[in-house]
Amino acid sequence: MAGGGTEAFPDLGEHCQDPDCKLLDFLPFTCDGCKLVFCLEHRSYKSHNCPKSDHGSRTVSICETCSIAIETTGFDEKGIKSLLEKHERSGDCDPNKKKKPTCPVKRCKEILTFANNLTCKYCGVKFCLKHRFPTDHVCNKKIINTAGTSSRWNERFMEALSLRNQKGCGRGSSVSSKSSPSVRSF
């Protein structure tokens, strides 16, 4: 018996070429990298430690101008750059084909333009008008330290309140007399 099979069917199946296996497999797999024959268990590149596992892999680069994928298999970094420059000089590179930015909220497909997007003041991400409020999108960051502004607001409120009541509210601050009262009676 030369390659595999049984005495009755000598051409049926082949032995796995993994050194630790040698299983007679009736439906063998031929590796497209190293061209050896393997059983079901050893058919993947990783399972038989294929030395040419990246043989069939493909790489692409995305053009920043038009968002077209350009195959760059087998090129080094310098070659990829020249390939992209060649594409940009050709008539195929059209900036109108570039994918427009969309709202980052899940399942929202609204295209963000200059007129319909707002940046969240808490997380700094651009959203469409429908999802502009922190409650409408999953806002990742909490309110940035606004203790200084809230204390100033409280001071202004207390000053206005003291003007209204004509009392110092225990603060002992002098109130300017040229400010007009907040409520007028006629």
Swiss-Prot record:
Disulfide bonds: none
Family matches, as InterPro entries: AN1-like_Znf, Znf_AN1
Binding locations of Zn(2+) 2: C31, C34, H48, C50
Matches recorded under Pfam families: zf-AN1
Taxonomic superkingdom: Eukaryota
One GO term (biological process): response to abscisic acid
SUPFAM superfamilies membership: AN1-like Zinc finger
Zinc finger region(s), AN1-type: 10-58, 97-147
Residues that, per the record, bind Zn(2+) 1: C16, C21, C39, H42
Function: May be involved in environmental stress response.
Name used for this protein in its record: Zinc finger AN1 domain-containing stress-associated protein 12
Provenance organism: Arabidopsis thaliana (Mouse-ear cress)
